UniProtKB/Swiss-Prot annotation:
Responsible for the low-affinity transport of potassium into the cell. Likely operates as a K(+):H(+) symporter. The keyword RNA-binding does not apply. The chain crosses the membrane at residues 9-29, 49-69, 101-121, 137-157, 163-183, 213-233, 247-267, 276-296, 337-357, 363-383, 395-415, 419-439. Belongs to the HAK/KUP transporter (TC 2.A.72) family. HAMAP family: Kup (MF_01522). It comes from Klebsiella pneumoniae subsp. pneumoniae (strain ATCC 700721 / MGH 78578). This is Low affinity potassium transport system protein Kup.
């Protein structure tokens, strides 16, 4: 590591604390309260307190520290992480059939994230604002309105970007974690007996004593690790080392101290179960704690919103979602984007959730099922990467996968009990997103296959046009081509109806590679097919936004000059008709028509000047 890198490590570590750990860092606000609230048939008993604390501690060690921090984060695509990245990596060295299975698993995981993300801002902010119940019980009716106001402000500022505000995130979250540690240590000092719960004996004893109920109670324990996927998803922003250093040096110690501090408080004062987090603080510090807790939960919500934007962009670029407007809010950081449609759809969903559930305890009953489902899928996909890509020993990978699933599957199974009490919400939202993504991908493939059924060879057509050329008009025509060696529909229809051809024709294909970025040296490939025909293939990563003006600037540097304002861009606009299908495929076809009708048009998608675009319509039956 260079000196510069060494100097930047503390800064990157601090930044990671501010963004990556917001969700898992605000879990102490509600986790232990939900574990011991009496919903499982037992109250604040010594064995129950020790059992829950032991389970939380070892879950943080095994699932977060070992599985995610140590193992899963090894799987990166040019430094990038996330469930769709893991899906892509897992499918590289497998059979076509296995790749299809892995793609389905990855899409389910991504869909689960969309389902859970509606709950995260609501439960985080509400649990902070509920500190009002401790400061002034008569203000409890204001919890829902204040929560909505706070989140409204957060969603409104998204279009302006979070660059300036984001600079405050890291110091605020560092203060938050230090407060967690100090408050927890203060309580542990007053009742050090609680440290016995570090012994895994108490976790085992908890299951033996409470039997079936203890299994169901795992649904509350999992609240302590919600947000764990963010460690992997945000890897590309900060790198592995800063995220790992932040976890082991600041986040993990602070969380453990605070959870055990709450446990120590409850052992002495069981009545504190109404809100053990805020009751850890001395009375004079309640208002400052309410303020810092609200700020921390807003930051946690911001991290989730940014995560949704990033996942959506990746899904769009990989062809699983329809094109939509993506606005870059920073000229310096490509990761800072704003997607208006997703922003306001998420905002409306969050407000509906807050109004419907009214209290964070009610939301906790819906929280966790999608998170644990994603954890199961992450274990399977990462084990596939270890075996197929890294060529690890088959026995070792098998034992490791069994160990992970022995934790993940019970956690997921325990959360299935939440379906009736609210777990149906993230599952339903996830199912909708999975349906949308698979519909767009499959119907788009069906459409392209239908359009290319004419079977004419591109080379043969070009040869024929050169031998018997139609009327030539001056200038350059660019035809957007979705695939190589396929005649663009717009070119066919221009020849059929207008019976003319430009002096110079460029067939442009924009391709998304299985990488976050493509180096400018590899951006453009130019091939002259005949004296008047050129093929240009422009490659982009899934974190990049295609820009046709940039493509032709690169072409000019490589000898194919093309002035944007003297070039005509021909595109086909398909008018779709649903053919004879079974009823369920007709429904899918209608959903695709709806998605296409609202998709971003190609000129806007590729930043082509509107006055240079000519769209030729065609009717296609799918």
């Amino acid at each position: 590591m260079s000196t510069d890198n060494k100097q930047s490590l503390p800064a990157l570590t601090l930044a990671a604390i501010g963004v990556v750990y917001g969700d898992i860092g605000t879990s102490p606000l509600y986790t232990l309260r939900e574990c011991l609230s009496g919903q499982f048939g037992f109250g604040v008993e010594r064995d129950a307190v020790f059992g829950f604390l032991s389970l939380i501690f070892w879950l943080l060690i095994f699932t977060v520290s070992i599985k995610y921090i140590t193992f899963v984060m090894r799987a990166d695509n040019a430094g990038e992480g996330g469930i769709l990245t893991l899906m892509s990596l897992a499918g590289r060295n497998t059979s076509a059939r296995m790749t299809s299975v892995l793609v389905i698993l990855g899409l389910i995981g991504g869909s689960f994230f969309y389902g859970e993300v509606v709950i995260t801002p609501a439960i985080s902010v509400m649990s902070a604002i509920e500190g009002l119940e401790i400061i002034a019980p008569q203000l409890d009716t204001w919890i829902v309105p204040i929560s909505i106001i706070v989140l409204t402000l957060l969603f409104v500022i998204q279009k302006h970007g979070t660059g300036m505000v984001g600079k405050l995130f890291a110091p605020i979250m560092l203060i938050w974690f230090l407060l967690l540690a100090v408050l927890g240590a203060r309580s542990i000092y007053a009742n050090p007996e609680v440290l016995q719960a570090l012994n895994p004996y108490w976790a085992v004893h908890f299951f033996l004593q409470y039997k079936t109920v203890s299994f169901i109670a795992l649904g509350a324990v999992v609240l302590s690790i919600t947000g764990v996927e963010a460690l992997y998803a945000d890897m590309g922003h900060f790198g592995k080392l800063p995220i790992r250093v932040a976890w082991f040096s600041v986040v993990l110690p602070s969380l453990v101290l605070n959870y055990f501090g709450q446990g120590a408080l409850l052992l002495k004062h069981p009545e504190a179960i109404k809100n053990p987090f805020f009751l850890l603080a001395p009375e004079w510090a309640l208002i400052p704690m309410l303020i810092i807790a609200t700020l921390a939960t807003v930051i946690a919500s911001q991290a989730v919103i940014s995560g949704v934007f990033s996942l959506t962009r990746q899904a769009v670029r990989l062809g699983y979602l329809s094109p939509m407007r993506i606005i870059h809010t920073s000229e310096m950081e490509s990761g800072q984007i704003y997607i208006p449609f997703i922003n306001w759809l998420l905002y409306v969903s969050v407000v509906i959730v807050i109004v419907s559930f009214e209290h964070s305890s009610n939301l906790a009953a819906a929280y966790g099922i999608a998170v644990t489902g994603t954890m199961v899928l992450t274990s399977i996909l990462s084990a596939t990467v270890a075996r197929k890509n890294w060529h690890w020993n088959k026995l070792f990978v098998g034992l490791m996968l069994v160990a992970f699933l022995c934790i993940d599957i019970p956690l997921f199974s325990a959360n299935l009990d939440k379906i009736v009490s609210g777990g149906w919400l993230p599952l339903s939202l996830g199912m909708v997103m999975f349906t949308v993504m698979t519909t767009w991908k499959s119907e788009r493939f069906r459409l392209l296959r239908r359009m290319h059924e004419h079977g004419n060879s591109l080379e043969a057509m070009i040869s024929s046009l050169e031998k018997s050329p139609p009327v030539r008009v001056p200038g350059t025509a660019v035809y957007m081509s979705r695939a190589l060696n396929v005649i663009p529909f717009a070119l066919l229809h221009n020849l059929k109806h207008n019976k003319v051809l430009h002096e110079r024709v460029i067939l442009l294909t924009l391709r998304t590679e299985d990488a976050p970025y493509v180096h400018n040296v590899r951006r453009v490939q130019i091939e002259q097919l005949s004296p008047s025909f050129w093929r240009v293939v422009a490659s982009y990563g899934w974190r990049e936004t295609p820009n046709v003006e940039e493509v032709f600037h690169r072409c000019g540097l490589e000898g194919l000059s093309c002035r944007m304002m003297e070039t005509s861009f021909f595109m086909s606009h398909e008018s779709l008709i649903i053919g004879k299908r079974p009823w369920y495929l007709r429904l899918r076809g209608k959903l695709y028509l709806l998605l296409q009708r609202n998709a971003l048009r190609a000129p806007d998608q590729f930043e082509i000047p509107p006055n240079r675009v000519i769209e030729l319509g065609t009717q296609v039956e799918i």
